[in-house]
Amino acid sequence: MTEQFDKTYCGFIAIVGRPNVGKSTLLNKILGQKISITSRKAQTTRHRIVGIKTEGAYQEIYVDTPGLHIEEKRAINRLMNRAASSAIGDVDLIIFVVDGTHWNADDEMVLNKLRNAKAPVVLAINKVDNIKNKDDLLPFITDLSSKFNFAHIVPISAQRGNNVHELEKIVRQSLREGVHHFPEDYVTDRSQRFMASEIIREKLMRFTGEELPYSVTVEIEQFKVNERGTYEINGLILVEREGQKKMVIGAGGQKIKTIGMEARADMERLFDNKVHLELWVKVKSGWADDERALRSLGYMDE
């Protein structure tokens, strides 16, 4: 039975930053489970992922965005940038994540976009455990403080969880009095079908290393429950060239077998249900440059 409170609090929080600074890792750490995929490759997140954390009277609704970056040559990159930018406009708090003291032109671009934001901005300096000379941190903070009026500046390690609880205290202070938007047991508003495609895509990123560029996506062609209660999931992996198809399949089909086994294990943990997963690979030339095709695959800019 849901506990009743005299007052409840709720708010929307956008997690923004350039690609590969740890936004998805931070969201997963806050939620206590993986809902947003992570990889050492930049721009792993392609969709706005909504993560929900409810504790007692407080509900935090997080938007984990694709990484904002300057390069916009392909249609998929333009859509991802627009999706990330639109997340900034309608939230109660913005968490701007940067990678230690590594500041570049993409960070500067994100900062300039935040100048028009109505919500307060918290700077989360991630991966501080990787900063070898901690004496570099204070001048870096001083320099950024002169560029922008941040509400708070919090050094964190999203991977290890260092100082993440301090960030959450700030988040909770930003919540407004109001009704909760989701039931207390929800951790995301995304469907199981969507989460299945994201899990497969994460394994693709992980097991193809640097071999496979970002011209790969996953379409769930079937997601049904059979008479035994098992989830039967068919995933179609789309690549742009025949050579990429061979990379995904691997010698003797070993790579796609590994991808499938690892993805199935993650799905069974997330869905708490037995899963039968089948994967196919198909060449669809130019899909990442075709906005109509991207929208049909679920890539939206709003």
Swiss-Prot record:
Residues 208-285 form the KH type-2 domain. It is found in: Cytoplasm; Cell inner membrane. Residues 126-129 are annotated as: G4. Residues 64-67 are annotated as: G3. Residues 9-177 form the Era-type G domain. One of its GO terms (cellular component) is plasma membrane. InterPro entries: G_ERA_dom (IPR030388), GTP-bd (IPR006073), GTPase_Era-like (IPR005662), KH_dom-like_a/b (IPR015946), KH_dom_type_2 (IPR004044), KH_sf_prok-type (IPR009019), P-loop_NTPase (IPR027417), Small_GTP-bd (IPR005225). Residues 156-158 are annotated as: G5. Monomer. This is GTPase Era. It comes from Haemophilus influenzae (strain ATCC 51907 / DSM 11121 / KW20 / Rd). The gene is era.
